[in-house]
């Protein structure tokens, strides 16, 4: 799956904003990964190098899905996040993605999917700061 990011923070987005090609590979989650995921990342880099003409290899074609529409939900204030979905999960429109509660207990909200799609990531930490990412989902 490919996601064309519109993020304005982080080193990979800084490079892209400066016209420098950038690639962010994300596999695993919660700081955990498998040796198979590491091997897949290495193969992705080799595939990119092949595409750019840096190396010449024959790779089996893998059909990719490009996420063209994505939503990145963020915390509106410091608080607590209770995710109800996991990365990779398919969700329907209006599905409950998680619940957010402000630190002072004055604000509560349910975060629901605005459209059907696939969860790209979810924050698994309980405590979140204002503007921290909560969950992202998208569709082709």
Region roles according to the model:
Residues 1-140:
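Structured catalytic-domain cores with a bias toward divalent-metal coordination
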